[in-house]
Regions:
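An N-cap/entry alpha-helix motif that binds or orients negatively charged groups
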Residues: 1-55, 59, 339-358, 368
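Short secondary-structure boundary/capping elements
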Residues: 46, 74, 78, 105-106, ...
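Short, charged beta->alpha transition segments
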Residues: 46-55, 79-83, 106-114, 139-143
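Active-site cofactor/substrate anionic-group-binding motifs, chiefly glycine-
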Residues: 54-106
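Alpha/beta enzyme core
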Residues: 83-84, 88, 115-122, 128-269, ...
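Internal helix-turn-beta structural module
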Residues: 304-343
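Short, intrinsically disordered C-terminal tails of secreted or membrane-associated proteins
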Residues: 364, 368-371
């Protein structure tokens, strides 16, 4: 274990809570999309159903507490508060990277939450790059077993590793090793980015490798280049990290691209999702679940109840949005079209962009997307 690992985790929490770690000009992109209001929904608000099945588990709402922390005393308290809230509300939870606990068993208790959340969908988490630094399928299995998880998240964070003074940056041949983990584990494997987004091309590769789901983790929420800028040890490191503040694929665009690339794979939308209307838009664009991190981290520094209140507000907003578009359940919401207010259509592959002439549509400033 690198001796700085617990301190790095503590730094990440402190910086995320105390500093401006937002993107400067990039947003998650959901403001570009608008639902068509339905004045005659023909359903009862009380009958709106937000439940969803994900990896064989039933959730009361399409929400996941995104992987955040562990490995520190504060991480233990935060994880327990998040888990108790997830248990009460009926949503899933991802843990922070378990690498620290694998290499220092005394840290395991900072991750264990099954005693306070026996029924939740719980996902273990490791950095995929560790498969190039001695980790094997057995390490992945141990990570799952030690926290009694229902699945494993492998996170991809090449840019973050490149910006960390202690980063591990050999990502060569990693796809084959991810495939080996998918074949070798008895539980589902989810692959996620950490805030810069998954492209369509990467999504196809991962789908072919056998992953059970993808978390696009797009740009627009916490900028981890900003976090690493605050951790930088010299001027050069700060300058390099600062240059990448607005790097990445916005979450809304990542969801659209990945859904088109892998039509049948469950998708988690995360990165800058802050309310239930954005959750509704993400589902209409192709997501199965939405992951939320920083708003719940802030709440978890206060109490279990604060996390419950934030989560309940998001779920209530989602239910009202579904009612306002006449969607009785999430399947209907997924088929609900959105109006794209910008005429600019990004194609992330090759960084091409295209615009339509006014003659291509009755409106040059909007178009309908997302119906499936």
């Amino acid at each position: 274990l690198r001796e700085d690992h617990p301190q790095r985790k503590a730094d990440h929490i402190r910086i995320s809570l105390e500093e401006d770690v937002s993107f400067e000009t990039v947003t998650a992109g959901f403001e570009r999309y608008r639902f068509v209001h339905c004045a005659l929904p023909e359903i009862s608000l009380a009958a709106v159903d937000t439940t969803v099945s994900f990896l064989g588990r039933r959730l009361e709402a399409p929400l996941l507490v995104s992987s955040m922390t562990g490995g520190t005393p504060q991480g233990r308290e935060v994880n327990c508060r998040l888990a108790r809230a997830a248990q009460e509300v009926g949503i899933g939870m991802g843990l922070g990277s378990l690498r620290a606990a694998l290499e220092d068993p005394t840290l395991l208790e900072t991750y264990r939450v099954r005693d306070v959340a026996p029924d939740i969908l719980l996902l273990a988490n490791l950095g995929a790059v560790q498969l190039n630094y001695g980790y094997t399928v057995d390490h992945c299995r141990r990570a799952v077993e030690m926290v009694e998880a229902d699945g494993l998240i492998l996170h991809l964070n090449p840019l973050q590793e490149a910006l960390q003074p202690e980063g591990q940056t050999d990502f060569s041949g990693l796809l084959r090793k991810i495939e080996e983990v998918c074949r070798g584990l008895e539980v589902p494997v989810i692959v996620k980015e950490v805030g810069w987004g998954l492209s369509a091309d990467v999504a196809r590769l991962l789908a072919d490798a056998g992953v059970a789901a993808l978390d696009v983790a797009g740009a627009g929420g916490t900028s981890w280049s900003q976090v690493e800028m605050y951790r930088a040890q010299n001027g050069l490191q700060r300058a390099v990290a600062a240059a990448f503040r607005d790097w990445g694929i916005p979450t809304a665009e990542a969801v659209r691209e990945v859904r088109c690339a892998v039509p049948h794979l469950p998708i988690i939308a995360s990165g800058g999702i802050r309310d239930g209307i954005q959750v509704a838009k993400a589902i209409a664009l192709g997501a199965t679940l939405c992951g939320i991190a920083r708003p719940l981290l802030v709440a978890a520094t206060e109490s279990d109840q604060a996390v419950v209140e934030v989560t309940t507000a998001i779920i209530t907003q989602l239910r009202v949005a579904m009612f306002a578009v006449g969607a009785p359940d999430l399947s209907a919401l997924a088929r609900t079209p959105l109006v794209e207010e910008s005429p600019l259509s990004y194609r992330w592959r090759g960084m091409r962009a295209s615009t339509r002439s006014p003659s291509a549509s009755s409106s040059a400033s909007s178009r309908t997307v997302g119906s499936r």
